[in-house]
């Protein structure tokens, strides 16, 4: 079972390493070698650590951090959903996504959005997200990647 905890600034390097491993393993074939190298260069202190101030979470299995996920409340956007390669296909990504959606529901957010990497579109579709049009993602670091903007309506429980 995945234990999910809120990330702290001290978790930035751990989260960055999960991201790097996941991209290098799961995005091969969807993006060029040059894009992959640019995407995974650097270190957490290059700006990734600032994400820890948002609704950023780590997923743990037997004391090991194996997944990350974030909900940007300013944009109702899901992001940074990564799972270590050795743990993919076991439902941990879905569990983290469900957690992020639950956080959104608790804040009465009716729809969440995301920019799916080309290799992750079918995963998100399987989780109820819709979107087909390919677009271009511009990262804060200047990286340009093809993506598919997707959205999911959430059922928000009325207050009683």
Task: Go through each PLM region and give its residues.
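Extreme N-terminal starter segment of soluble prokaryotic enzymes
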Residues: 1-3
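Acetyl-CoA-dependent GNAT
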Residues: 6-12, 17-86, 97-99, 103, ...
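Short, P/G- and charge-enriched loop/turn segments at secondary-structure junctions
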Residues: 44-47, 135-139
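Residue-level detector of beta-propeller blades
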Residues: 65, 131-133
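Residue-level recognition of the GNAT/N-acetyltransferase active site
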Residues: 84-88, 115-117
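Conserved G/P- and acidic residue-centered "switch" motifs that form tight phosphate/ATP-binding loops
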Residues: 91-93
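C-terminal "cap" of GNAT-fold acetyltransferases
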Residues: 110, 114-121, 127, 137-160
């Amino acid at each position: 079972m995945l234990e999910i905890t809120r990330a702290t600034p001290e978790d930035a390097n751990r989260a960055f390493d999960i991201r790097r491993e996941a991209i290098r393993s799961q995005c091969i074939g969807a993006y060029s070698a040059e894009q992959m190298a640019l995407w995974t260069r650097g270190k957490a202190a290059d700006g990734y650590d600032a994400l820890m101030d948002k609704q950023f979470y780590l997923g743990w299995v037997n004391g090991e951090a194996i997944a990350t996920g974030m909900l940007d409340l300013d944009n109702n956007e899901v992001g940074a959903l990564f799972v270590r390669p050795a743990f993919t296909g076991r439902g941990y990504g879905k569990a983290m996504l469900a957690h992020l959606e639950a956080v959104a529901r608790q804040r009465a957010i009716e729809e969440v959005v995301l920019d799916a990497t080309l290799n992750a579109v079918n995963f998100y579709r399987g989780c109820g997200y819709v979107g087909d049009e390919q677009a271009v993602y511009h990262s804060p670091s200047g990286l340009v990647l093809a993506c598919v903007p997707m959205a999911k309506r959430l059922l928000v429980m009325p207050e009683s």
